[in-house]
């Protein structure tokens, strides 16, 4: 959260404020997010999050990934201030549906954001198995290969770190600063049809830590992508 972000809030009363930024601002000012943005936050939810961080929490859940608006994905990545961590198998939708997705990552890296991108290795047993489980055969392999080929020319770009992994993914995660989009994977169902949770670090620190630890374990065992082009 920086001065530019606060200015956007002041200039546009209907600006969609990210959960983590709203709670951070409320903590600094000694109030609740509802006090600052009554149209975006319910009183009970805001107080529950502020006073009971270790108990049940309220987060945004979508029944499928396709229900999360494209604009929400775009703003999620565009707002990055310190770090972006992406853990996926193929995620070709990022390149196909988010206008200028790669440019957004490159711009973030150029301004000092540390970007880490974990993409599935198309030539591994885990990728082949996922295609069999989803009933689409080699389509998953082709998608992984497409994403790798799109990323490869940018491997080695300062601030943009890309690695390939061979793990079985139970969740795909898209962390930007203190907000994470979590795409669960249900057996036999493609990612686009599976639930998505939008989670703030402040919602449930233990769950956040578990997801971060999973990313770290996969990152440590992954292989750096070799630059092409």
Positions of PLM-derived features:
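Short acidic-hydrophobic, aromatic-tinged amphipathic segments that line or gate anion-handling sites
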Residues: 60-67, 162-166, 200-201
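PLD-like (HKD) phosphodiesterase/transphosphatidyltransferase domain
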Residues: 47-126, 214-217, 224
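HKD-type phospholipase D/PLD-like phosphodiesterase module
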Residues: 121, 126-171
């Amino acid at each position: 959260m920086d001065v530019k972000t606060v200015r956007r809030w002041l200039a546009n009363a209907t600006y969609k404020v990210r959960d983590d930024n709203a709670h951070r601002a409320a903590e600094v000012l000694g109030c609740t997010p509802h006090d600052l943005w009554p149209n975006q936050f319910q009183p009970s939810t805001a107080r529950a999050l502020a006073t009971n961080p270790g108990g049940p929490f309220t987060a945004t859940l979508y029944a499928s990934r396709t229900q999360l608006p494209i604009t929400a994905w775009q703003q999620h990545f565009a707002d990055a201030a310190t770090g972006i961590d992406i853990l996926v198998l193929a995620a070709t939708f990022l390149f196909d549906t988010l206008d200028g997705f790669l440019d957004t990552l490159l711009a973030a890296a150029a301004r000092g954001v540390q970007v880490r991108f974990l993409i599935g290795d198309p030539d591994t047993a885990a990728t082949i198995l996922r295609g069999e489980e989803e009933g689409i055969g080699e389509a998953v392999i082709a998608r992984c290969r497409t994403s790798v080929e799109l990323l490869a020319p940018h491997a080695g770009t300062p601030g943009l770190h890309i690695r390939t992994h061979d793990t079985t993914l139970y969740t795909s995660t898209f962390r930007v600063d203190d907000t994470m989009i979590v795409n669960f994977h249900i057996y036999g169902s493609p990612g686009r049809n599976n639930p998505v949770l939008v989670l703030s670090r402040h919602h449930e620190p233990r769950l956040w830590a578990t997801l971060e630890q999973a990313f770290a374990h996969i990152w440590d065992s992954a292989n750096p992508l070799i630059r092409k082009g």
